[in-house]
């Protein structure tokens, strides 16, 4: 009897394992190539420079009907050179006049948008997320804990543009490698995914399907292949400032400090310097936060503290 019990248990476990493998979503792979000619980042994707790589499409819904084809498809291309990663996106829409195109501040994600998710370390835990809306508003987030935490205070330097046409809307991105972190392998493999949101339909679709019951998000992304001989770019950002103040008023006789006019000058800088691929030096000289956006007024009527986002650049 024990033999048959062990035998049927083994058959059950093997069957369950085979069932799990059959239902596992296979990883999608996009193979990029090094560009021959640099594209102009103007939002139009008809530049000949994009012809060196192929389109990839076949997005699937994430919300509201996970796994089903989206209402409108999306396709993209990726290529690179020594310093930048380039992404072109075509977001189809049969009703372009209904595309939600909202102008907002940076990181304002209201409206139709696409998110390019790059796990450049391929640690399947963290990712850099670059977002552009149909209005060309850009935003960025740093995702950690396998997609459990999203930090939108990260503000790298990169370039994007978007245009609306009779087929929907298009976008181009130019992302400096200096804003990413990656290993030293001769040929890189990065985690990669693209998320599209159609605002009026409250619909999200992904290039690499990730079922809603799947644990993890970054770890389930597709893969970007073909990145060869990348050289880590040292990050160097310098943001100087100068503040001039001139006051004019009636002079006071006998007062050498009230001559009728005052002139003041103040200057300083913020800097971000890449020491190594894993270490960045942030420094400030004579910081002046007079131009920083003030926190909005708020009154707490409950027992919870109010959290305000840090607006000062250095912090």
Per-region residue spans from a language model:
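Sec-dependent signal peptide recognition
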Residues: 2-10
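Hydrophobic h-region of N-terminal signal peptides that target proteins for export
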Residues: 10-20
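Structural preference for beta-rich elements and adjacent junctions enriched in aromatics
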Residues: 21-315
């Amino acid at each position: 009897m024990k033999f048959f019990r062990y035998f049927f248990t083994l058959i059950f476990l093997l069957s369950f394992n085979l069932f799990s493998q059959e239902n596992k979503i296979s990883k999608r792979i996009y193979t990029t190539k090094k560009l021959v000619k640099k594209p102009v980042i103007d939002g139009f994707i008809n530049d000949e420079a994009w012809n060196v790589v192929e389109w990839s499409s076949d997005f699937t819904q994430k919300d509201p009907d996970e796994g089903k084809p989206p209402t409108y498809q999306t396709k993209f291309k990726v290529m690179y050179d020594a310093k930048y990663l380039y992404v072109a996106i075509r977001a189809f829409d049969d009703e372009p006049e209904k595309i939600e195109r909202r102008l907002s501040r940076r990181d304002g994600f209201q409206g139709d948008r696409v998110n390019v998710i790059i796990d450049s370390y391929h640690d399947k835990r963290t990712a850099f997320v670059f977002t552009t809306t149909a209005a060309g508003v850009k935003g960025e987030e740093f995702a950690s804990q396998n997609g459990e935490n999203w930090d939108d205070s990260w503000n790298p330097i990169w370039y994007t543009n978007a245009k609306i046409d009779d087929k929907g809307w298009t976008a181009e991105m130019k992302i400096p490698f200096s804003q990413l972190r990656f290993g030293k392998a001769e040929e890189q493999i990065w985690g990669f995914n693209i998320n599209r949101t159609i605002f009026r339909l409250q619909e999200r679709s992904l290039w690499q399907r990730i079922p809603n019951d799947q644990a993890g998000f970054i770890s389930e992304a597709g893969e970007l292949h073909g990145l060869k001989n990348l050289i880590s770019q040292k990050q160097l950002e310098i943001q100087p400032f100068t503040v001039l103040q001139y006051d004019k008023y009636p002079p006071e006789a006998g007062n050498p400090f009230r001559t009728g006019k005052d002139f003041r000058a103040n200057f300083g800088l913020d800097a971000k310097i890449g020491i190594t691929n894993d270490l960045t030096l942030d420094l400030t000289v004579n910081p002046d936060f007079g131009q920083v956006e003030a926190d909005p007024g708020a009154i707490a009527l409950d027992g919870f503290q109010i959290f305000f986002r840090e607006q000062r650049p250095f912090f």
